[in-house]
Amino acid sequence: MASSAQNATVSFCQEKWNHFLDVVGDEPERLWVYGTVLLIFIIYWLYAAVLTLVDFTKKPHFVRKYKLQPGKNDPVDTKRLLPALRVVLFNQTFVAIPLAYGLYHFVYKYQNTLNIRELPSIQQTVFDLALCCVLEEIIFYYGHRLLHYGALYRYIHKKHHEWTSPIAVVAHYCHPIEHILANTFPIALSLGVVRAHLVTGWIFFAIATYNILSDHAGYAFPWSLISVPFHDYHHATFNYNFGVYGWLDRLHGTYGAYDKSGQIEASHRPQQKQE
């Protein structure tokens, strides 16, 4: 019974995928480059718009009890927000499109020989996504820690840390080099190593975009992933929680968490912001 249902699901998805490609075309470069950039852009701004509306209207009222770092950046400073949005848009267009083009021609084009029209099995998709998560954690953790050292922090990563109590829409507010090294490479290179199918890549980019918005939203909803308070804690303390999922932070002793009252552990409180 389960096998029949799975086969029916795969057949349905394959049919819809073929129809989609019949409409938009099945040229790999166009799909990997512009399809990926457009997917990220749509998910980012739709979800960010909802969360930004919550930030400005403070409605629905029940969400306020899930606010992390209450009283900070509340209300949102629009004078800081508007320039930040320009940076976000720059990163998502003038940085992202050439980067996606380069990644396709130097990574995906040679690493991936899969038939773009033939969807992978459910088992293969789940396995590839799980492996990508492990690789993403490794690449992001060590890359992120590197960005906290000396000149790399001062001239590149510090820009992102201007928001010690961030909101969702500034998730991509960062130096262009950081957008390449931290926001894109951990995901894109993981997919290249795994040699994932385009659809698996889109699923992974969609999940990653949702996660980065949730991680910077400033709200720990009941349905939020554990990474939400985890990454918010990083913005509040600077020197803890460098990873995506916390696995390597626990290994290297850089893991931190808010106490039951929502306060930063005393020994983790920064004396001053890094310069």
Specify the residue positions occupied by each region the protein language model found.
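Transmembrane alpha-helix/helix-exit interface in multi-pass inner-membrane proteins
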Residues: 96-109, 133-154
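Hydrophobic alpha-helical transmembrane segments of multi-pass integral membrane proteins
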Residues: 38-48, 89-104, 131, 182-189
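Membrane-embedded alpha-helical segments that form the functional core of polytopic membrane enzymes
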Residues: 120-141, 145, 201-214
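Long, highly hydrophobic alpha-helical transmembrane signal-anchor segments
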Residues: 2-38, 94-125
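Hydrophobic alpha-helical transmembrane segments
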Residues: 34-38, 85, 126, 130, ...
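Alpha-helical membrane-spanning segments of integral membrane proteins, especially the hydrophobic core
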Residues: 76-97, 117-137, 171-172
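N-terminal helical submodule of small eukaryotic multi-pass membrane proteins
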Residues: 41, 55-109
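Cytosolic/stromal cytosol-facing helical appendages immediately following the last transmembrane segment
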Residues: 1-26, 30-34, 53-63, 67-76, ...
